[in-house]
Amino acid sequence: MGIKRYKPTSPGRRGMTVSDFAEITKFEPEKSLTEPLKKHAGRNNHGHITTRHRGGGHKRRYRLIDFKRKKFDIPAKVAGIEYDPNRSANIALLHYTDGEKRYIIAPLGLKVGDTLMAGPNAEIRVGNALPLANIPIGSQIHNIELTPGRGGQLVRSAGNTAQLMAREGNYATVRLPSGEMRMVHIKCMATLGQVGNVDHQNIMIGKAGRSRWLGRRPVVRGSAMNPVDHPHGGGEGRAPTGMNPKTKWGKPAMGKKTRHNPRTQRFIVRTRKQK
């Protein structure tokens, strides 16, 4: 993938970059693998905002992605690489020899015409999915399950990759992109290779309107609000907050640990903060 730059014909164009979509080979989605995607603008079933700064954006259809890769020992040919508006990674359309079609996250280096397979007996090559018990130590992997059969939950966004570091007993140790070292059951599936579309992180949005196309609404600083709206609000002119950073609801912000899951804490060998 390459980056396309625009001439500075306007302040919004200056610095704006887009993907050149060189990897994309198919421009219309497989209709049988899509479904309507209703917009909620960050609201829950009561109509209350639970996620701020969401709303608007271009209409989308959801692409049904196969995160489980449970069609074992059935070869599939890559029919196309497509853009997916619902995620940063591109997706690949697979045509299985039994006639079924499925989408997967497109790994780096996958090309149209490649043959992929999933299962314990699959070949060690990019795009194939195997249990962690059957993947060589040191391999780059993505789309990693946390619970066997549940489907990939970790390392799914553009350019990301994890590394299989060790295996001991029923657990494998995986180094995640954040630097965290985590134990995952060896029956969990993972896909070989790195997620494609690696230049996604280098794209410059360029102007506010382009964020609105993506469904992102403006973010207002607390210090620019009134005291009734935010703990940082009020004062004459640009006033200091006079306190440790707080959220809009008075909770500690910036640096406060928010992880509260002691059940899975024992699976974390090293946190992302430890060196």
UniProtKB/Swiss-Prot annotation:
Keywords: Ribonucleoprotein, Ribosomal protein, RNA-binding, rRNA-binding. Residues 39-59, 254-275 have a biased composition (Basic residues). PROSITE patterns: RIBOSOMAL_L2. GO terms for molecular function: rRNA binding; structural constituent of ribosome; transferase activity. Pfam families: Ribosomal_L2, Ribosomal_L2_C. One of its GO terms (biological process) is cytoplasmic translation. It comes from the Bacteria. Residues 38-59, 222-275 are annotated as: Disordered. The keyword Cell cycle does not apply. GO terms for cellular component: large ribosomal subunit. Belongs to the universal ribosomal protein uL2 family. One of the primary rRNA binding proteins. Required for association of the 30S and 50S subunits to form the 70S ribosome, for tRNA binding and peptide bond formation. It has been suggested to have peptidyltransferase activity; this is somewhat controversial. Makes several contacts with the 16S rRNA in the 70S ribosome. Part of the 50S ribosomal subunit. Forms a bridge to the 30S subunit in the 70S ribosome. NCBIfam families: rplB_bact. This is Large ribosomal subunit protein uL2. The lineage of its organism: Bacteria, Bacillati, Chloroflexota, Chloroflexia, Herpetosiphonales.
